[in-house]
Amino acid sequence: MENGAGRDDGSGKDPSERPRRTTIYSLIVGMAFIALIAIAGINTISTQNKGVLGASNEGDMPLAQFAVPNARTGAGGDANIAQDDCDSARIPCPSGNQRTPACRVDVPGAIRVCDLFDKPLVLSFWFTRGGDCENQEDVFQRAYRRFSRQVNFLAVDVRDSDSEVRKLIAEHHWTHPVGLDRDGALSNLYRVGGCPTFVYAYPGGIFQATSIGKLSDQQFFSKVDALIAASKQRAATVR
């Protein structure tokens, strides 16, 4: 906005100088804002769908089924995201040739999410391009050590090389399960846009909540505790 250039306000200064200083200030602020956007972009990935899975009220929505290669075994192939109920499910199925549903695959070294539905479940989608993602996986590991008898945990790396992921597993001494989403198809299905993205689910693979971004140990543990409590309450009321 311009402020009446050419009018004397009694200050004795040439009014034509003030718009120039305002313009310079606006330019500096604008450049700082662009820098912030660029920094934020480091912790995001591009997906074809807007919004994180469950960010709005999804109701009793089942998690999309998937099977991923185990990062520790070096199993080949991409994530399998074929569903077993394509005709009736609210979750989209991949186009193209018919594939074996993810939870029916029998491939050595594959991690099937359906095998984790016997307990509450926490998924972590992460990638090395995110500034805090590696540290957040350390938080995820500590939660795994604390809650693994009550809750299942699975981390899914998005589009990093197998060797890089295995190197990080060894360096950080992670013992929680880690799967690979080599081509990003799974992260797109789950509408992952930030790093890390945590997905929380009730037993049976029913969506409960998501959280995006950095969490302290206390914050993350509180969310897992809340999932456990909500799962018990749900089990007592849902038949």
Sequence positions of predicted segments:
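Conserved segment of the thioredoxin-like fold in thiol-based oxidoreductases
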Residues: N135-R182
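Thiol/disulfide oxidoreductase modules built on the thioredoxin-like
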Residues: D118, K167-T175, R182-K232
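Extracytoplasmic
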Residues: M61-L63, P108, L116-D118, S148
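Conserved redox-active cysteine motifs that mediate thiol-disulfide chemistry
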Residues: F117, F125-R142
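Hydrophobic beta-strand anchors of alpha/beta hydrolase catalytic cores
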Residues: V122-L123, F153, F198
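N-terminal targeting signals for export/organelle localization
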Residues: M1-N97, Q233-R239
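Short, ordered coil/turn segments that flank beta-strands lining enzyme active or ligand-binding pockets
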Residues: A71, D106, P203
